[in-house]
Each structure stands twice: as structure tokens, then as C-alpha cells.
Amino acid sequence: MIARRNPEPLRFLPDEARSLPPPKLTDPRLLYIGFLGYCSGLIDNLIRRRPVATAGLHRQLLYITAFFFAGYYLVKREDYLYAVRDREMFGYMKLHPEDFPEEDKKTYGEIFEKFHPIR
């Protein structure tokens, strides 16, 4: 894969990313990362030999919140990187239309074989 031209060093989320819509709070990726935070709280209890599910509920809630917050920005960065890649790809396709010819659209009748019921 070709590296981006003029990448901004040490920038997690450039100002250009503000134009993208924010990820929804019910995004499955965010919920999964929040669940990983809950699991890390359980593992912390297990390592410290506390009751796994009941000890330190406030700590588990803190892990969930911290992981969800970090995951929000990771998902936002991922969406930004995909948007940059798509913009570059579509720009290339616009500049080189001879490499991407339009294909004729086929109907379902042309794709599927004739149906002959066997009795």
C-alpha cells in the first residue's frame, strides 16, 4: 500500500477529521471496547485475588468509561483514515478513467439460467 503523501507527524486526529460525522454511541465497535474494559476490571480482580464479579464495582465502571472514551477516539481515527483512503482512491479513479471501464449492467434474466421444473 502506498503511504499517504504529506502525512502529519505526531497528530492523532487532524483538524480535517472534524468534518466527519461523529461515531454513534451505540456503535458495536464502541460497545465491544466498553465490554473489554469490563473484562479488564474482572481480570484485575482475579489477579489481585478479590471476588471477581462483586469486588470493586466502582473500579469496573471506571474501566468501562475509560475504555469507552478511548475507543470513541480510536473509532473516530479509524473512520478518518478510511475517509482519507477513500478520497485518494476515488481521486485516482477520477484521474484515470481508462483503468476503470464502465461495465454493462446485466438483467437477472441474463445472469440466471432458464428454470425448467422437473416432475
UniProtKB/Swiss-Prot annotation:
Cellular compartments per GO CC: mitochondrial inner membrane; respiratory chain complex I
Taxonomic superkingdom: Eukaryota
Membrane disposition: Single-pass membrane protein
Coiled-coil intervals: none
Electron transport is among the record's keywords: yes
Family per similarity comment: Belongs to the complex I NDUFC2 subunit family.
Descriptive protein name: NADH dehydrogenase [ubiquinone] 1 subunit C2
Native organism: Pan troglodytes
